[in-house]
Regions:
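Conserved beta/loop motifs at nucleotide-recognition and modification sites
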Residues: 43
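Short cysteine clusters
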Residues: 86
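Rhodanese-like catalytic fold shared by cysteine-dependent sulfurtransferases
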Residues: 1-40, 48-81, 90-127
Length: 127
């Protein structure tokens, strides 16, 4: 009985990690590591008004609909990690498919979007 409880607890704790990894969602802390250690490029796929209200320091704004046409100019080195961001993580998850189609291999979506970034106490800047 105790072994079953331990296995069940372990599976429940591991499930969100596996789900995040398979969906491409990236925690805010992991995003910071990629930015600092691997010079990841951060692209915010929100609309310009949302971007102006607050965005990750150093991020570039390319609305989701413009991504296929403008991503190559903003993220020239396809070998660097690319972190896509939006308010909640929904648009950035959709943007991942477009980025992969354009040849970007190290593409991530910030899990939970800017809401998760703010919850982690990480800084934002406004235009």
């Amino acid at each position: 009985m105790l072994i079953a409880l331990v296995l069940t607890s372990g599976a429940l704790l591991l499930a969100p990690v596996l789900q995040n990894a398979s969906s491409g969602g990236l925690s805010a802390n992991d995003a910071v590591s990629l930015i600092n250690r691997e010079k990841a490029v951060v692209v915010d796929v929100c609309e310009p008004s949302e971007f102006a209200a607050g965005h990750i320091v150093g991020s570039k704004n390319i609305p989701l609909d413009d991504l296929p046409a403008k991503l190559a100019a903003a993220a020239k080195n396809k070998g660097l990690p690319l972190i896509l961001v939006c308010q909640s993580g929904a648009r950035s998850a959709r943007a991942m498919a477009a980025a992969k189609t354009l040849g970007y291999e190290k593409v991530h979506s910030l899990g939970g979007g800017l809401a998760a970034w703010k919850s982690a106490g990480l800084p934002l800047e406004k235009v």
